[in-house]
């Protein structure tokens, strides 16, 4: 016969109950489902507090401690300053880790919401209460997990963009780096100016792949590292006799510049042929084993020497075919159209365009139309020269209209388009400094000089390089003076760059692009 069981002693109060039993008794004592709902909401906003209230003190304390640590980390980043944030935000490892961390946080947060509600819910909840609780937990989980998942996707896309586009070896990027001492406050040291070669390359779907990239547009952006004052120098693609410095190995092969020695009109020796032709005619490692893009390196040296600026610090190649996707990702750009611009067409073969971009003020163009705005030349006066003028207006529009809110709202599309559109040798460890410099540029007015007949005695077949270099130095002084706030430098009239025909003023002063890209329709 079994021994009779003894009755367990009744606890004097709730404090003598185990945590789980105490929480269940409390909720059951309230007998009201709405308090479980209220504390589920509170526990969602402050993860762990719902568990604590339900009697899961240890679990609640751990979750609240982790949440507090995340809040403190966010406060630190918010007060650490832009330099620290951009340094972390341009680190592939940090972005990849953050992406994974956000996904883990989403899973843990959702689990805490569900666990908290189950612990808070009355022991004898009705079927309706269980369904209502499930809907509540699902809605709260969706509200928390969605932004975290989007953030994870954005940071992952950013990491992929950085890893694809920018140089992965900061110790030997192929660019020109300053040897002057640098600090966080002055990342450029004593380097007063950064020169970036911008190449608009045509390697699109309609071009034979065997022909390689054609440098359809060539500009040098010279930027003052202190003020952000910037000047774009545009050279015609048919420019001949691009020189090389005597201390460059290229001078041995082209002592008189990139020239066949006979005909300055030989298209195989034009500026736009350098990218493909020179690498095929020189030893592969002539410029160093570290150089990954010989064509771009050749142009950095040659164009920098031609303008008297020295070798460009970095290059940026923009694939014109992918340019459409990039502009579409930005949501389009707004430009003034001062005369009819053809969409397609071939003047030499008398093939008419398939359409026109009609004149108008503040016309919002998608990627396709923006590309033709920059490239159209069928029976346009000045042809290549007018096209060069419009190309700098496109660059100015992108710089001025790519606002942070626009970039953030379209970040995934921009990152995907950028990875397919842009090549550069800017190293990742220089990105924080470049971002800071870009923000300075955004707060200034871009200036520009297009080398064309009427500017510095320009002749494409035989450019007067000493006069060109003097004009470059004059333009830099004008931009620095205008942006330095000492005096305002009068800019060329809007008609100067908006019309296809160059004017006298274009040869005497650099143009402020906010003026030269204004609406001033051709008569």
Where are these regions (language model features)?
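Juxtamembrane loop-transmembrane helix junctions in multi-pass integral membrane proteins
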Residues: 31, 54, 89-96, 131
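Membrane-embedded alpha-helical segments of integral membrane proteins
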Residues: 68-120
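Hydrophobic alpha-helical transmembrane segments
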Residues: 39, 43, 103-109, 320
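Hydrophobic, aromatic-rich membrane-embedded alpha-helical segments
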Residues: 30-59, 64
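Non-catalytic, solvent-exposed segments at the cell envelope interface
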Residues: 154-523
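Cytoplasmic membrane-interface segments at the C-terminal ends of transmembrane helices
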Residues: 50-58, 109-132
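Acidic/Ser-Thr/Pro-Gly-rich, low-complexity N-terminal segments
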Residues: 1-26
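Internal/C-terminal transmembrane anchor helices
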Residues: 126-160
């Amino acid at each position: 016969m079994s021994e009779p069981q003894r009755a367990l002693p009744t606890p004097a109060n709730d404090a003598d109950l185990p945590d789980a039993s105490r929480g269940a008794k409390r909720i059951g004592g309230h007998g009201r489902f709405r308090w479980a709902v209220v504390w589920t909401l509170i526990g969602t906003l402050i993860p762990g507090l719902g568990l604590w209230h339900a009697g899961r003190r240890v679990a609640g304390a751990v979750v609240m401690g982790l949440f507090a640590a995340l809040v403190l980390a966010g406060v630190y980043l918010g007060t650490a300053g832009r330099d620290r944030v951009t340094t972390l935000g341009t680190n592939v490892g940090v972005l990849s880790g953050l992406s994974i961390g956000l996904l883990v946080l989403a899973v843990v947060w959702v689990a805490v919401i569900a666990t908290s509600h189950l612990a808070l819910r009355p022991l004898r909840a009705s079927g309706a209460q269980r369904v209502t609780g499930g809907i509540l937990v699902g809605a709260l989980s969706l509200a928390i997990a969605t932004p975290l998942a989007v953030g994870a996707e954005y940071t992952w896309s950013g990491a992929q963009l950085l890893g694809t586009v920018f140089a992965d070896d900061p110790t030997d990027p192929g660019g020109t780096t300053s040897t002057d001492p640098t600090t966080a406050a002055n990342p450029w040291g004593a380097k007063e100016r950064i020169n970036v070669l911008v190449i608009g390359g045509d390697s699109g779907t309609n071009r034979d792949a065997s022909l390689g990239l054609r440098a359809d547009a060539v500009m040098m952006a010279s930027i003052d590292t202190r003020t952000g004052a910037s000047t774009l120098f545009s050279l015609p693609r048919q420019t001949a006799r691009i020189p090389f410095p005597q201390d460059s190995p290229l001078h041995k092969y082209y002592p008189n510049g990139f020239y066949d020695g006979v005909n300055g009109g030989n298209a195989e020796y034009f500026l736009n042929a350098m990218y493909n032709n020179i690498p095929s005619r020189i030893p592969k490692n002539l410029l160093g084993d570290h150089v990954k893009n010989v064509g771009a390196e050749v142009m950095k040296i040659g164009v920098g020497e031609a303008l008297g600026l020295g070798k460009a610090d970095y290059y940026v190649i923009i694939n014109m075919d992918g340019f459409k996707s990039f502009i579409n990702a930005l949501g389009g750009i707004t430009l003034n159209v001062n005369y009819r611009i053809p969409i397609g067409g071939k003047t030499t073969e008398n093939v008419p365009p398939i359409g026109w971009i009609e004149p108008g003020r503040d016309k919002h163009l998608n990627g396709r139309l923006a590309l033709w705005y920059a490239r159209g030349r069928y029976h346009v006066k000045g042809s290549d020269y007018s096209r060069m003028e419009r190309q700098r207006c496109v660059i100015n529009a992108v710089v001025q209209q790519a606002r942070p809110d626009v970039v953030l709202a379209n970040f995934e599309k921009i990152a995907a388009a950028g990875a397919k559109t842009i090549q550069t040798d800017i190293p990742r460890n220089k990105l924080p400094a470049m971002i800071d410099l870009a923000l300075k540029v955004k707060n200034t007015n871009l200036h520009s000089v297009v080398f064309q007949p009427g500017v510095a005695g320009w002749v494409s077949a035989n450019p007067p390089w000493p006069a060109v270099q003097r004009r470059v130095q004059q333009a830099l002084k004008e931009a620095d003076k205008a942006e330095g706030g000492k005096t305002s430098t009068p800019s060329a009239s809007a008609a100067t760059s908006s019309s296809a025909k160059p004017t006298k003023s274009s040869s005497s002063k650099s143009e402020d692009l906010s003026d030269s890209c204004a609406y001033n329709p051709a008569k």
